[in-house]
């Protein structure tokens, strides 16, 4: 059923989206006065949990997953059903359950032990917890923004769009996995010695990070980058014994936890070999400290930085290289830039960034949450989102 409904949706969307991306009601004038969040595009707040880094890795996630185990099981079952819909023999999930646990020892610390602890506390097979974590390396469709006002103050915003082609619910026009991720969305305060090391918004059960900040120092978001030399190849290489690259979610978390400066973080994100192509959107705490790092798995292709002295007071990154045209079915870059230009540099705030991220198609059916970050003021907030019809699928 999932496979058939997905195929129907893809065929229909390919026809309609080509015409709809730049046509009302799928797009709209730049939104205003959407903040503080309310109304039909606001699903609700994201709950906070503390992750104690002083605990052994095996135990760090037990308290959180004791609350979230039922919804995590629901999502893992949905992913299994989707896989089985495309490979009815069940051999893919059999391989996940039988082969992946044997690779846990090759996952770098502390991530392997954290996954083992999550599997035990939830009762979900370890292989499926590992695959759940791999899953985030491959399906992240996002919009990230860094801005700088006339006084050199930086803001960082992002829409987390996730779940493309992962089951379409024809009864309510939503992506199955996107909707099931919303109750799994959590704000995390990672602490050591009862003091915050970094904060992040993530999904319960995932030990990497995609969105976070280190108070007073830096902010970091991760967007997927589509490439022929893509994440599937990197994951397969890792599974077959080539372990010289880091998972992108792991390197993001490591930078948030351990980096001591914007420049150090930029150097790590630019030079470290990674399993999947990606965009790292990195912000600092001083004028000009904001960039988009475009990565292949083994090298950096481009570092595009804020340059306010020459009029570049924002950077916008979706899922396409900045020097290339976006796919005509999926242009979130143009409306985001249009709305930022309409906002103007002198009016930058959490409210106006949220307005930009609330404007269709920047906001779309894949949007799980919106995050706003002010590094220097130690402000970090995330909000669950909805995109009621009429709304584009991505």
From Swiss-Prot:
Cell location: Lysosome; Secreted
Biological role stated in the UniProt entry: Lysosomal ceramidase that hydrolyzes sphingolipid ceramides into sphingosine and free fatty acids at acidic pH. Ceramides, sphingosine, and its phosphorylated form sphingosine-1-phosphate are bioactive lipids that mediate cellular signaling pathways regulating several biological processes including cell proliferation, apoptosis and differentiation. Has a higher catalytic efficiency towards C12-ceramides versus other ceramides. Also catalyzes the reverse reaction allowing the synthesis of ceramides from fatty acids and sphingosine.
Assembly and binders: Heterodimer; disulfide-linked. The heterodimer is composed of the disulfide-linked alpha and beta chains produced by autocatalytic cleavage of the precursor.
KW Secreted (keyword) present: yes
Pfam families listed in its UniProt record: CBAH, NAAA-beta
One GO biological process term: lung development
Catalytic residues, chain numbering: 142
Name of the protein: Acid ceramidase
Disulfide bridge map: 30-339, 387-391
An annotated GO cellular component: lysosome
EC supergroup of this enzyme: hydrolase
InterPro entries: Acid_ceramidase-like (IPR016699), Acid_ceramidase_N (IPR029130), CBAH/NAAA_C (IPR029132)
Catalyzed reactions per annotation: an N-acylsphing-4-enine + H2O = sphing-4-enine + a fatty acid; N-dodecanoylsphing-4-enine + H2O = dodecanoate + sphing-4-enine; N-tetradecanoylsphing-4-enine + H2O = tetradecanoate + sphing-4-enine; N-hexadecanoylsphing-4-enine + H2O = sphing-4-enine + hexadecanoate
Chief location: other
Family the UniProt entry places it in: Belongs to the acid ceramidase family.
This protein's pathway: Lipid metabolism; sphingolipid metabolism
Range of residues in the leader sequence: 1-20
UniProt keyword terms in alphabetical order: Disulfide bond, Glycoprotein, Hydrolase, Lipid metabolism, Lysosome, Secreted, Signal, Sphingolipid metabolism, Zymogen
Glycosylation: residue positions: 194, 258, 285, 341
GO molecular function: fatty acid amide hydrolase activity; hydrolase activity, acting on carbon-nitrogen (but not peptide) bonds, in linear amides; N-acylsphingosine amidohydrolase activity
Post-translational modification: N-glycosylated. Proteolytically cleaved into two chains alpha and beta that remain associated via a disulfide bond. Cleavage gives rise to a conformation change that activates the enzyme. The same catalytic Cys residue mediates the autoproteolytic cleavage and subsequent hydrolysis of lipid substrates. The beta chain may undergo an additional C-terminal processing.
E.C. numbers: 3.5.1.23, 3.5.1.-
Positions bearing the site annotation: Important for catalytic activity: 161, 319, 332
């Amino acid at each position: 059923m999932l496979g058939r409904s997905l195929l129907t949706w893809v065929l229909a969307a390919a026809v309609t989206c080509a015409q709809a991306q730049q046509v009302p009601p799928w797009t709209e004038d730049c939104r205003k006065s959407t903040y503080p969040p309310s109304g039909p595009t606001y699903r609700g707040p994201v709950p906070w949990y503390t992750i104690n880094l002083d605990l052994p890795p095996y135990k760090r996630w037990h308290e959180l997953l004791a609350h979230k185990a039922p919804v995590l099981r629901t999502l893992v079952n949905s992913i299994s059903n989707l896989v089985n819909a495309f490979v009815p023999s069940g051999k893919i999930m059999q391989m996940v359950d039988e082969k992946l646990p044997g690779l846990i020892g090759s996952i770098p610390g502390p991530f392997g032990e954290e996954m083992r602890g999550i599997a035990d506390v939830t009762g979900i097979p370890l292989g499926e917890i590992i695959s759940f974590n791999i899953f985030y390396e491959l399906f992240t469709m996002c919009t990230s923004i860094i801005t700088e006002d006339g006084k050199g103050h930086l803001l960082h915003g992002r829409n987390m769009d996730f779940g493309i082609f992962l089951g379409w619910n024809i009864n309510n026009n939503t992506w199955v996995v996107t909707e099931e991720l919303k109750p799994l969305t959590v704000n995390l305060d990672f602490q050591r010695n009862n003091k915050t090391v970094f904060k992040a918004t993530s999904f319960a059960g995932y030990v990497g990070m995609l969105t976070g900040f280190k108070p007073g120092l830096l902010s970091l978001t991760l967007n997927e980058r589509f490439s022929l030399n893509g994440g599937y190849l990197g994951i397969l290489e890792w599974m077959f014994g080539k372990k010289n690259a880091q998972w992108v979610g792991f390197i993001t978390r490591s930078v948030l936890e351990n980096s001591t400066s914007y420049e150090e973080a930029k150097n790590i994100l630019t030079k470290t070999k990674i399993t999947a192509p990606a965009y790292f959107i990195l912000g600092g705490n001083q004028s000009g400290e904001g960039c988009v790092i475009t990565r292949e798995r083994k090298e950096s292709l481009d570092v595009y930085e804020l340059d306010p002295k020459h009029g570049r007071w924002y950077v916008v990154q979706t899922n396409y290289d900045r020097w290339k045209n976006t796919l005509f079915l999926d242009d979130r870059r143009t409306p985001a830039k249009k709305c930022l230009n309409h906002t103007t540099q002198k009016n930058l705030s959490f409210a106006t960034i949220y307005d930009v991220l609330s404007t269709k198609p920047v906001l779309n059916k894949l949007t799980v949450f919106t995050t706003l970050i002010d590094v220097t003021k130690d402000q970090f907030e995330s909000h669950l989102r909805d995109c009621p019809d009429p709304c584009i699928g991505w």
